[in-house]
């Protein structure tokens, strides 16, 4: 007959093994996936706030920025998606730099396409 130490060791091993098996099965179960999806759907999406031209935006300034009618939105696809939204004053201040950046990016893509041919 096995000794008391052997029996305790086997009992401890089996309890730990069952714990490990239960943890793995709960991870793979559909209920766990449903709970994860519910948790993700409850999180509100992060909303980005544009920066002011001078200083930081206060709560009263954000409504003015959101209601601005003279906004410009630029989107283009490279190996990744990029979106830029500017108000009229921001476009006048940063328009040349943005145009130069876009020309450089698009020019690199054109040069790479020509080199591949």
Curated annotation (Swiss-Prot):
Q: Where is the lipid attached (O-octanoyl serine)?
A: 26
Q: How is it modified after translation?
A: O-octanoylated by GOAT/MBOAT4. O-octanoylation is essential for ghrelin activity. Amidation of Leu-98 is essential for obestatin activity.
Which InterPro entries does the annotation name? Answer: Motilin_assoc, Motilin_ghrelin, Preproghrelin
Q: Does the keyword DNA-binding apply?
A: no
Question: What residues does the annotated propeptide cover?
Answer: 52-75, 99-117
> What are the Basic and acidic residues biased-composition ranges?
31-43
Extent of the signal sequence: 1-23
User: What does the record give under GO molecular function?
Assistant: ghrelin receptor binding; growth hormone-releasing hormone activity; hormone activity; protein tyrosine kinase activator activity
Q: Which residues carry this modification: Leucine amide?
A: 98
Where does this protein chiefly localize? Answer: secreted
Q: Domain of life, per the record?
A: Eukaryota
Coiled-coil segments: none
Gene Ontology process terms (BP): actin polymerization or depolymerization; decidualization; dendrite development; excitatory postsynaptic potential; gastric acid secretion; negative regulation of apoptotic process; negative regulation of circadian sleep/wake cycle, REM sleep; negative regulation of endothelial cell proliferation
Q: Name one GO cellular component term.
A: postsynapse
Q: What disulfide bonds does the UniProt entry report for this chain?
A: none
Keywords for the protein's UniProt record, in alphabetical order: Amidation, Hormone, Lipoprotein, Secreted, Signal
Name the residues where the record annotates lipidation as O-decanoyl serine.
26
Q: Lipid link (O-hexanoyl serine) located at?
A: 26
Give the residue ranges for region: Disordered.
Answer: 30-68
Cell location: Secreted
Q: Which Pfam families match?
A: Motilin_assoc, Motilin_ghrelin
Q: Does the keyword Signal apply?
A: yes
Q: Which family does it belong to?
A: Belongs to the motilin family.
Q: What is this protein called?
A: Appetite-regulating hormone
State the gene name recorded for this protein.
GHRL
């Amino acid at each position: 007959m096995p000794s008391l130490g052997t029996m305790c060791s086997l009992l401890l091993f089996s309890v730990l093994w069952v714990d490990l098996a239960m943890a793995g099965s709960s991870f793979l179960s559909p209920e766990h996936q449903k709970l994860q999806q519910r948790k993700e759907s409850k999180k509100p999406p992060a909303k980005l706030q544009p920066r002011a031209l001078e200083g930081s935006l206060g709560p009263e300034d954000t409504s003015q920025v959101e209601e601005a009618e003279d906004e410009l939105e630029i989107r283009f696809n490279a190996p990744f998606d990029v979106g830029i939204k500017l108000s009229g004053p921001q476009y006048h201040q940063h328009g040349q730099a943005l145009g130069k950046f876009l020309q450089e990016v698009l020019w690199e893509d054109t040069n790479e396409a020509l080199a591949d041919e």
